[in-house]
């Protein structure tokens, strides 16, 4: 079955603009509809990835890793995200991708790099690096749906040098996009990304699978850094940004501007409203999961440390709104005194 032109269209538009394409990384409890809409409002990438979705759960709601709203796409979103699937059973990927196709999704990405212990114990994520036959089987199964199939992985499990064989194996599967996080599973995010191997990855792609788009992830802070990286490494197609959005929700801004605390708190208020709307549809996520986002908006360099600390004691979104309202009144009084 012929795959959809999802990725080729994204890459072609970026190339016409003289830049790499940009995506926001799949992140657990982060890249759901709520945060995707916030980032889209601030500065959108070319496309988004969903949270991690257990492949079996899409057609079997009784699994231990249920979907719980991970596939929900709000009407306000301009496009459906790439669904990131994890697991190791080919049959699960065949049935999951067929169901996703019927729901109107165009692309799936297979997680082959997550270092989480629970995921690995259940034979997903970076466990596929140690079991390349599983990787080959799930890619082949996903392709039967006709969706665009990509994969996201790391350089290796324990050693950087593993990429010579591992990345070659994945490139041989003819995926639409191969995203490489420039660290090993063992390194997590504790060491700098291995940018020294990027040119070698490009050479491997050109030799083995010239039609596969190569995307890099790891230590790329923003749009400008991504453009510079692509210029330094001709042949690099895409840039994925993950943790960079926690340092700057405007990370995908092509022409960087200054953003004051008022604007950042406006994004937070937007996220609170979207969170409440999502909570009326699903029983997750719980309010405490929101607290990880406060540091994005109440930034120390903007004098908002006390505000952030106060919000961390909140018990609900309404509590946060009251704290923000009181803070803004205080700021107006201070500015006019």
Tell me what each language-model feature is.
Residues 1-18, 22-23, 34, 144, ...:
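Alpha/beta catalytic cores of nucleotide-metabolism and tRNA/nucleoside-modifying enzymes
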Residues 123-129, 187-188, 256-258:
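Short glycine-enriched, charge-decorated loop/helix-capping segments at active-site entrances
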Residues 63-64, 74, 117-127:
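An active-site metal/cofactor-coordinating segment within enzyme catalytic domains
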Residues 2-12, 27-99:
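Glycine-rich, positively charged N-terminal anion/phosphate-binding segment
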Residues 27-29, 53-55, 86-88, 113-115, ...:
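Active-site beta-loop-alpha junctions enriched in small/polar residues
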Residues 94-108, 112-122, 133-214:
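Alpha/beta enzyme core
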């Amino acid at each position: 079955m012929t795959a959809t032109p999802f990725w080729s269209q994204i890459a072609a538009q970026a190339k016409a603009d003289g830049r790499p394409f940009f995506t926001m990384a799949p992140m657990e409890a982060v890249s759901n509809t709520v945060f995707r809409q916030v980032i889209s409002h601030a500065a959108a990438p070319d496309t988004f990835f969903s949270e991690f979705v257990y492949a079996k759960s899409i057609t079997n709601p009784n699994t231990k890793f249920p979907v719980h709203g991970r596939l929900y796409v709000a009407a306000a979103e301009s496009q459906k995200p790439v669904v990131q699937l994890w697991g190791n059973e080919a049959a699960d990927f065949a049935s999951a991708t067929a169901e996703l196709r019927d729901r109107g999704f165009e692309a799936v990405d297979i997680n082959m790099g997550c270092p989480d212990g629970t995921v690995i114990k259940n034979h997903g994520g970076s466990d596929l690096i140690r079991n390349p036959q599983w990787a080959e089987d799930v890619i082949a199964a996903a392709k039967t749906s006709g969706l665009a199939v990509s994969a996201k992985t790391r350089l290796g499990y324990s050693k950087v040098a593993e990429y010579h064989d591992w990345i070659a194996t994945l490139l041989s599967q003819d995926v639409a996009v191969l995203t490489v996080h420039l660290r090993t599973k063992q390194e997590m995010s504790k060491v700098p990304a291995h940018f020294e191997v990027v040119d070698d990855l490009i050479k491997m792609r050109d030799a083995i699978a010239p039609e596969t788009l190569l995307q890099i992830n790891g230590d790329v802070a923003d749009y400008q850094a991504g453009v510079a990286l692509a210029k330094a490494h001709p042949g690099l197609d895409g840039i994925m940004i993950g943790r960079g959005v926690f340092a700057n929700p405007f990370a995908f801004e092509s022409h960087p501007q200054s953003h004051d605390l008022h604007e950042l708190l406006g994004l937070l208020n937007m996220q609170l409203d979207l969170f409440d709307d999502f909570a009326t549809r699903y029983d997750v996520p719980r309010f405490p999961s929101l607290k990880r986002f406060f540091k994005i908006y109440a930034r120390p360099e903007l004098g908002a440390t006390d505000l952030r600390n106060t919000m961390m004691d909140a018990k609900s979104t309404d509590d946060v709104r009251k704290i923000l309202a009181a803070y803004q009144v205080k700021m107006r009084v201070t500015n006019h005194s």
